[in-house]
A protein has these predicted regions:
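Bacterial N-terminal signal peptides that target proteins for export
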Residues: 1-11
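Bacterial N-terminal signal peptides
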Residues: 9-19
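N-terminal soluble domains immediately following signal/targeting peptides that reside
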Residues: 23-160
Length: 160
């Protein structure tokens, strides 16, 4: 049996180890996407995709998510702010189509400092997702998205 002084010392040591935990234990906000959307859930009718948002500090709200549709239509660069809809699932938001049928488009979706680039095919379906990141200890750390990354992705998409 531990004596009270040993127990207090052990508890204090454990507390100090926890309090001094390295920053790499923390994780940044993260985004993942669901597409195609369940066609049998009538509340999601018209949704192109679902955004799953996660943070270490709790469940994100709709005000935490932002985005834009970035496109090239008839050779002209376009940017359209996106609005997201809450769903019945916490931290999951629906995105309905808000951009033109013509041209090549990608979606820039952000949750705080994490940004994803979602590419769309010629039919408007999700064809890829990229969260630009650096890596630390084998894990991705989201980094800011440069305008040139959006432009080069659109240039490649419009060539197809």
């Amino acid at each position: 049996m531990l004596r009270p002084t040993r127990f207090a010392s052990l508890a204090a040591a454990l507390f100090m180890m926890t309090a001094a935990a390295p920053a790499h234990v923390k994780w940044p906000p993260w985004l993942s996407f669901e597409s195609p959307v369940n066609p049998y859930d009538r509340s999601l009718d018209g949704s192109v995709l679902l955004v799953h948002a996660a943070t270490r500090d709790g469940t994100p709200t709709i005000s935490d998510v932002s985005g834009s549709a970035e496109g090239i239509v008839n050779g002209v660069r376009r940017s359209i702010p996106l609005s997201f809809d809450a769903t019945s699932r916490p931290g999951v938001f629906a995105l309905r189509k808000q951009w033109a049928n013509e041209g090549s488009w990608l979606l820039r979706v952000s949750l705080h400092e994490t940004t994803a680039l979602v590419t769309l095919d010629a039919l408007g379906r999700v064809s890829g997702v990229n969260i630009p990141a650096t890596f630390a200890e084998g894990r991705p750390i989201p980094r800011p998205v440069a305008a040139r990354e959006i432009d080069s992705t659109l240039t490649v998409a419009s060539a197809h």
